[in-house]
Amino acid sequence: MANVVVFFAQVFEEIEGLATVDILRRAGHTVHTVGLGSEVITGSHQISVKMDDVLDTFYWADIDALVLPGGLPGATHLRDDDFLMKKLKEYSKKGKIIAAICAAPIALHRAGLLKDKKYTCYPGVEKDINQGSYTGHLVEVDGKLITGCGPAATFEFAYTIAEALGTDTSALREGMQYNKLLKK
C-alpha cells in the first residue's frame, strides 16, 4: 500500500486531520503524522495529538501523498513554513498526490500548485487565492491535486485520496456506514 504524510500545525481542525488519518489507515495505507515544530500538536478544539514525527527530522522516502488539514490558524502555519513549501513543490513535480482541505489550500497557493487547477476550499478562503479556478464543490480533483471544502467533506476527501492511491473504497464506505448518509 501507499505511504502518506499528514502534516499537523498548532490549531488544526481535528475532524479534517484525524478522520483523514483514520480512513486512510483503515484503507490499508501507511500514514505518518508529522508535526510542524512540535511532537504534540493541539487542535482548534483543544485535542492534543502526539505525532509520529516532526517535520525537521522526518525521513522523506517513498512518499506517495502529502495531506494538509485545515483549521485556522493551523493552515496559515502550514502556509508560512518554507521547508514545507519546498517539499510540496518537490513532490508535486514528482507527480505525487497533494491534498488539502478547508483553509489549507492557502498553502498550495503559496507553493504555486493551484495555477491552472480547479480547487475547492472553505467558503471565503478563495478570496485569498489568486490562482486556479474555485469550484465550491465538496471535493475537487484536478490531476494529482485533491481539495476539500471543510469539515463536512472530510470523509469524501479521505476516500478520494484512498481511491487516488489505488484503493477500492466501496467495502470501506459500506463498513463505515458512510453509504447510509447518502440515503434519505
Could you say what each language-model-derived stretch is?
Residues A19-T20, K87:
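Hydrophobic residues within alpha-helices
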Residues V34, E39-H45:
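Membrane-interfacial amphipathic helices and adjacent loop/beta segments
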Residues H45-D53:
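Short gly/ser/thr-rich secondary-structure transition/capping motifs
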